[in-house]
């Protein structure tokens, strides 16, 4: 009898856990309104605790296997409905990722934008690309703005031998500090060494 009860208990725990994980990872209507859905995905914890990333999508009415994944910049999140609609009208499924500790992915106890290395965002991009492919998209282009341009450029460089996307579109990428010679070669190294 005890063995039978133990099996029932284990079944109930597994069933509840699976239901919780599945309900957490389902698309739900997004704050952008009609035609936009968001899915929040639990990621492995980092040095500050729990981490999530959020995938927002707007699907084209065309029968298409093409998609764009948009990566926002610093102190930002995805809100550009017109951008998504423009890609949808051009027969692209549109996706955007709110990176960990930004926008929809910022949890109450977190410090906004806190990462120690930009490569921490690669897991968010990999997760988004995997989900986009699982939804039947085979031709995927990354698009990024500002610091997202720096992150995606580093991502593509790190994956140069097995690039998981067909292209990269950069919108006003943050690739350089744009300082004069004195600041860049003299002042910044002194201030950096000083701490």
Can you describe what each PLM-predicted range is?
Residues 74-75, 103-139:
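Catalytic nucleophile-loop/oxyanion-hole region of alpha/beta-hydrolase
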């Amino acid at each position: 009898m005890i063995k039978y009860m133990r099996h029932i208990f284990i079944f109930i725990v597994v069933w509840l856990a699976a239901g919780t994980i599945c309900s957490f990872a389902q698309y739900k209507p997004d704050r952008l309104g009609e035609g936009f859905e968001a899915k929040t995905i639990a990621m492995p914890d980092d040095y500050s605790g729990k981490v999530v990333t959020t995938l927002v999508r707007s699907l084209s009415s065309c029968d298409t296997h093409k998609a764009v994944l948009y990566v926002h910049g610093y102190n930002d999140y995805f809100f550009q409905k017109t951008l998504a609609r423009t890609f949808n009208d051009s027969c692209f499924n549109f996706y955007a990722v709110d990176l960990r500790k930004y926008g929809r992915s910022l949890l109450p106890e977190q410090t906004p934008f806190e990462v120690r290395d930009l490569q921490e965002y690669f897991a968010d991009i990999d997760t988004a690309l995997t989900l986009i492919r699982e939804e039947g998209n085979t031709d995927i282009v990354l698009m990024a703005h500002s610091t997202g341009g720096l992150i995606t450029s580093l991502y593509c460089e790190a994956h140069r031998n097995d690039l998981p996307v067909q292209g990269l579109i950069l919108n006003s990428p943050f690739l350089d500090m744009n300082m004069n010679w004195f600041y860049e070669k003299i002042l910044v190294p002194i201030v950096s060494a000083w701490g």
